[in-house]
């Protein structure tokens, strides 16, 4: 009897193993249509998209082999954001939503269709109602968070501008991620001897006038991961440079393009993290059971040419630990 039970147990184990291997093979052989829905076009979000594709490829999901990508950009248009989300909910096996407004739209459009969503470049998933307090969600959504290292940025600004007292922050009033980050700056600024002077805008068209009012009353500007504001970085830099006021960026591409320095997020790496999450979902894990992940931090970057033009002396300690991204 014991021998019979051993044989039956062994046969059952072999059967289960065969079924698992068969399921894995079917998953590997299946072809997926993945939507990449991007809220706006600027380097941070572009890098997220590229990193996402790279992260999926590293996990074995390669464009042209077992993945077809449908990529659309809403150009910061809220109406178009809703349309893209609704279309992808009908056409895709999984949607990667880039930036908070797109993530919220994709969540609303995809949940009733049973299409999983993986978001990225969302600074406050809980505040945006995309995750519970424990980082999970009962529905098929997960993703990655690009919350800024606010205290590190304040420390950086203090090192670059020892005599500064007021930091200006432009933000879009309809972006929940921006409001969350602004509150963090307001909470921590006093500990570093700063006062935050905020200026809210509704659209990019408001940015120029807001800068005209803000710049005379601050020593510098620092950027959030605000999609509308960052999309108008060239306008911000033109006006700030004319006023002799430095702009501190929220990631490396902004520093390459004219901000003086940043302790911000490395978005290629964040996109890769998101691609790895998507691979888990495509492999059969329910998205809502995967807690969102946070950015793993990036290297401090500075632009020595911008600093020189603004007569800012970069401390040796900051030069030693950071990376100069000036175009030489």
Labelled PLM ranges:
Residues 21-25:
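Juxtamembrane cytosolic interface motif at the C-terminal end of transmembrane helices
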Residues 10-20:
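Bacterial N-terminal signal peptides
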Residues 3-8, 26-328:
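Short hydrophobic alpha-helices and adjacent helix-cap/hinge residues
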